Amino acid sequence: MTYSCPFSIEELAYDEAVRIAHDTGKISGDAGPLLETVVDMLDELERPDSHFDCIQIAGTNGKTSTSRFAASILGGEGLKCALYTSPELVHMEERMEILGAPVAPEQFAHGVSAAREAGRRVNLRREEAGEARYTITPFDLLTVAAMV
């Protein structure tokens, strides 16, 4: 099953997507960083994360190495693997990989475009309901973008 964005989005150029990923201030509010921000943005996108199985690796040290080991093992067993890590070494799209290769700049820009629009829609709905707009952090935006 493949995923497609449930609404039209303005596709950003790569350079603009990188700029927005570094500074999410224009789509953010002042509700503070909350887990619900990412959940509501994914809900707005009709849960792209439900189209594949995920492994989350958490902890203080060694997350990227452990993630890469896991992706390599799973890929060696014939499974298609995507990887989302941080930080990047040189280019922001290095945070997102598919089958061991960084996503193309256009794919990165598409993910950021979809995440930005989802955040805008969620915050508009919150504002209309008299609720504080979510603070959408760069990490929130990129986490949602990686799922698209």
Regions found by a protein language model. Give the residues of each.
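Short functional linear segments
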Residues: M1-G59, T66-L79, L83-Y84, L124-R133
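ATP-dependent carboxylate-amine ligase catalytic core
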Residues: L35, D40-D43, P48-S50, G76-V148
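Short active-site-proximal "capping" loops at secondary-structure junctions
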Residues: G62-K63, L89
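Short, electropositive, low-hydrophobicity segments enriched in small/polar residues
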Residues: K63-T66, A104
